From Swiss-Prot:
<dbReference type="GO" id="GO:0006661">
    <property type="term" value="P:phosphatidylinositol biosynthetic process"/>
</dbReference>
<keyword id="KW-0472">Membrane</keyword>
<feature type="region of interest" description="Important for interaction with membranes">
    <location>
        <begin position="264"/>
        <end position="272"/>
    </location>
</feature>
<feature type="region of interest" description="Disordered">
    <location>
        <begin position="1"/>
        <end position="82"/>
    </location>
</feature>
<feature type="region of interest" description="G-loop">
    <location>
        <begin position="126"/>
        <end position="132"/>
    </location>
</feature>
<feature type="region of interest" description="Important for interaction with membranes">
    <location>
        <begin position="357"/>
        <end position="366"/>
    </location>
</feature>
<keyword id="KW-0256">Endoplasmic reticulum</keyword>
<feature type="compositionally biased region" description="Acidic residues">
    <location>
        <begin position="53"/>
        <end position="64"/>
    </location>
</feature>
<keyword id="KW-0418">Kinase</keyword>
<feature type="modified residue" description="Phosphoserine">
    <location>
        <position position="45"/>
    </location>
</feature>
<feature type="binding site">
    <location>
        <position position="344"/>
    </location>
    <ligand>
        <name>ATP</name>
    </ligand>
</feature>
<keyword id="KW-0443">Lipid metabolism</keyword>
<feature type="compositionally biased region" description="Basic and acidic residues">
    <location>
        <begin position="1"/>
        <end position="11"/>
    </location>
</feature>
<dbReference type="GO" id="GO:0005768">
    <property type="term" value="C:endosome"/>
</dbReference>
<comment type="function">
    <text>Together with PI4K2A and the type III PI4Ks (PIK4CA and PIK4CB) it contributes to the overall PI4-kinase activity of the cell. This contribution may be especially significant in plasma membrane, endosomal and Golgi compartments. The phosphorylation of phosphatidylinositol (PI) to PI4P is the first committed step in the generation of phosphatidylinositol 4,5-bisphosphate (PIP2), a precursor of the second messenger inositol 1,4,5-trisphosphate (InsP3). Contributes to the production of InsP3 in stimulated cells and is likely to be involved in the regulation of vesicular trafficking.</text>
</comment>
<dbReference type="GO" id="GO:0005886">
    <property type="term" value="C:plasma membrane"/>
</dbReference>
<keyword id="KW-0067">ATP-binding</keyword>
Length: 481
């Protein structure tokens, strides 16, 4: 599969000077003409017209059971409207693109991030990992989030780290993950939070798609040269410089995940727990949190879940005290003495099950916690959702609203992604009903559940809708189970 082109490289919607047309990165789906039309819902929030559901079902869209739904841009708060900005800014504000009317708290966090960048407190590149990711700070220099630009993903053209380049040169036959859509990790990150939120798992820190611009991001020489040239033109010939669509570096689209404090890698705590077993009440809490991680990873078919990219917070001195409300705010005020945070979800939502070189197993499957059958608590929480066909369809619609914002979006490929996810949900439903354990869950043969051509394409799923279930018989060359 060819890599989809960068979404940040679209020309602006309205005409402009030649300099505007040659800019390296543009805002796809966010043209200036669209700003006049407020968005009915943020990406990942499908707008549902239940009264017209029957009519839509009869219409029978041939491509997907999902409406096209234009996505416009709305402003995040009245405070942003009141902020006065010059006609031409050297670092163009991204607040117009980061609009979250339905989440004022997140909008405020993004506003603080933008203000910090404007005063010279730039995002700091994270040394770990195989892609360009950055700690984003507020004006007080406190880390508030992690930004992962699309163009700097592991297989992106502007990845500042050489790991994947060496991989591509030295071992091209194993380069990339053939089951994933290239350079859509930022959507996978946001999609994982969407699934987590819909199922009320509360283990993924809030993650959304945003736009940011910073001198510390990795840009090519052409973009930096253009930026310097436009700044020089604005300084020397203001009349000409003011005609540019943008002065400064182009904004980058990517995922922004809220930073969580007090967590360490799971590998660290798992070794601790082996030497010093947890008290029974804490052990039950950890088992519940672990099962939530299993459910999330299995549904989205995370292909990159080791014990080093999920986090655990457990501080013994706080066991007898109330956990800081601010630290637990992102888990809907539900207090836990031990808490798991599922980060690094950028390599999920495959369009087929892994069937080439590697199996990409879930490393948690070999932990002792994976041998314990799913608890009654988790079964009661999850089964009512995933056993409801309308809920599953609703989830697919929300993911459609999110994924379609990418310039390289393809409906057929998206439907393949949903077929894999529906198959995972089917297996999970059966495993929960049968009282299986996470280890037994991953041993169930993989299936895909495709919508048949004769199935209804309406917004509401009826029992008459027909799906085709297919067992995935082809296994990877290196298989773990």
């Amino acid at each position: 599969m060819e890599d989809p082109s960068e979404p940040d490289r679209l020309a602006s919607a309205d005409g402009g000077s030649p300099e505007e047309e040659e800019d390296g990165e543009r805002e796809p789906l966010l043209p200036r003409i669209a700003w006049a039309h407020p968005r009915r819902g943020a990406p990942g929030s499908a707008v549902r017209l239940l009264d017209a559901a029957g009519e839509e079902g009869e219409a029978g869209d041939e491509e997907l059971p999902l409406p096209p739904g234009d996505v416009g841009v709305s402003r995040s708060s009245s405070a942003e409207l009141d902020r006065s900005r010059p006609a031409v800014s050297v670092t163009i504000g991204t607040s117009e693109m980061n609009a979250f009317l339905d989440d004022p708290e997140f909008a405020d966090i993004m506003l603080r991030a933008e203000q910090a960048i404007e005063v010279g407190i730039f995002p700091e590149r994270i040394s770990q990992g195989s892609s360009g990711s950055y700690f984003v700070k507020d004006p007080k220099r406190k880390i508030i989030g992690v930004f992962k630009p699309k163009s700097e993903e592991p297989y992106g053209q502007l990845n500042p780290k050489w790991t994947k380049y060496v991989h591509k040169v030295c071992c091209p036959c194993c380069f990339g993950r053939g089951c994933l859509i290239p350079n859509q990790g930022y959507l996978s990150e946001a999609g994982a939070y969407l699934v987590d939120n819909k199922l009320h798992l509360s283990i993924v820190p809030k993650t959304k798609v945003v736009w940011l611009v910073s001198e510390t991001f990795n840009y090519n020489a052409i973009d930096r040269a253009k930026s310097r040239g436009k700044k020089y033109a604005l300084e020397k010939v203001p009349k000409v410089g003011r005609k540019f669509h943008r002065i400064g570096l182009p904004p980058k689209i990517g995922s922004f995940q809220l930073f969580v404090e007090g967590y360490k890698e799971a590998e660290y705590w798992l070794r601790k727990f082996e030497a010093d077993p947890l008290p029974e009440n804490i052990r039950k809490q950890f088992q519940s949190q672990f099962e939530r991680l299993v459910i999330l990873d299995y549904i989205i078919r995370n292909t990159d879940r080791g014990n080093d990219n999920w986090l655990v917070r457990y501080e013994k001195q706080k066991c007898e005290k109330e956990i800081d409300h601010k630290e637990s705010k992102w888990i809907d005020d539900e207090e836990f003495l031990i808490k798991i945070a599922a980060i690094d979800n950028g390599l999920a939502f495959p369009f087929k099950h892994p069937d080439e070189w590697r199996a990409y197993p879930f490393h948690w499957a070999w932990l002792p916690q994976a041998k314990v059958p799913f608890s009654e608590e988790i079964r009661n929480l999850i089964l009512p959702y995933i056993s409801d066909m309308n809920f599953v369809q609703d989830l697919c619609e929300d993911l459609y609203e999110l994924f379609k914002t990418d310039k390289g979006f393809d409906k057929a490929t998206f439907e393949s992604q949903m077929s894999v996810m529906r198959g995972q949900i089917l297996n999970l439903t059966q495993a929960l009903r049968d009282g299986k354990s996470p280890f037994q869950l991953v041993q169930i043969p993989c299936v895909i559940v495709e919508r048949s051509q004769g199935g209804s394409q309406g917004r509401i799923v009826h029992l008459s809708n027909s799906f085709t279930q297919t067992v995935n018989c082809r296994k990877p060359f290196f298989s773990s189970w």
